[in-house]
From Swiss-Prot:
Comment field on protein domains: Consists of three domains, a large central CORE domain and two small peripheral domains, NMPbind and LID, which undergo movements during catalysis. The LID domain closes over the site of phosphoryl transfer upon ATP binding. Assembling and dissambling the active center during each catalytic cycle provides an effective means to prevent ATP hydrolysis.
Gene this protein is translated from: adk
Function: Catalyzes the reversible transfer of the terminal phosphate group between ATP and AMP. Plays an important role in cellular energy homeostasis and in adenine nucleotide metabolism.
Organism: Xylella fastidiosa (strain 9a5c)
Region spans: LID: 126-136
Protein name: Adenylate kinase
Enzyme class, spelled out: transferase
Residues that bind ATP: 10-15, 127, 172
Pathway: Purine metabolism; AMP biosynthesis via salvage pathway; AMP from ADP: step 1/1
Length: 187
């Protein structure tokens, strides 16, 4: 099962990816974690990314797709993977699609975790308050969610056109949402 988890900040993507890793017995690939590990390992792509980040810029899609190509060549992904945090825009979705076609392993499904904005704001602002972070005010969270929605809406359409988008209600207990994902995937 080759799967992407999509959802706005606070939707529970990382939490559900960790749960699905156990349920489906396939690796969870977080692009953020992948980027950090490549930088720490000092790989050529990691060194490029480190230089870009040191200048305060965003890591290019070409570097990210290169890191993903390297990661997807490992033997632990033979039975599949769960990708979280990528793609974030249409250009990345097209690049991922091209990479997976080249590898002969297209995606089986893209799960969109759907959570109402008010619930997301409550989750993120509550988490920020618990962690003592003052930057995640309700207004700041709403702005982040709008940026996410603007960039990700075309990605959702991209996968919907391919017939692999599954919309799952992301509200509820961890086990309830996990069960909805398993049912949607037909596992």
């Amino acid at each position: 099962m080759r799967l992407v988890l999509l959802g706005p900040p606070g939707s529970g993507k990382g939490t559900q990816a960790a749960q699905m890793k156990e349920t489906l017995q396939i690796p969870h690939i977080s692009t953020g974690d992948l980027l950090r590990s490549e930088v720490v390992a000092g790989t050529p792509l990691g060194l490029q990314a480190k230089q870009v980040m040191a200048q305060g810029d965003l890591v290019s899609d070409a570097i990210l797709i290169g890191m993903l190509e390297s990661r997807l060549s490992h033997t632990d992904v033979v039975k599949g993977f769960i990708l979280d945090g990528y793609p974030r825009n249409l250009s990345q979705a097209a690049a991922l699609d091209g990479l997976l076609a080249k590898l002969g392993h297209p995606l089986n499904a893209v799960v969109q975790l759907e959570v109402p904005t008010d619930v997301l704001v409550e989750r993120i602002a509550g988490r920020a308050q618990a962690e003592g972070r003052e930057d995640d005010t309700p207004d700041a969270v709403r702005k982040r969610l709008q940026v996410y929605n603007d960039s990700t809406a075309p990605v959702i359409g991209f996968y919907q056109q391919r017939g692999i988008l599954l919309r799952v209600d992301g509200v509820g207990r961890l086990d309830e949402v996990s069960q909805r994902i398993v049912v949607a995937l037909g596992c």
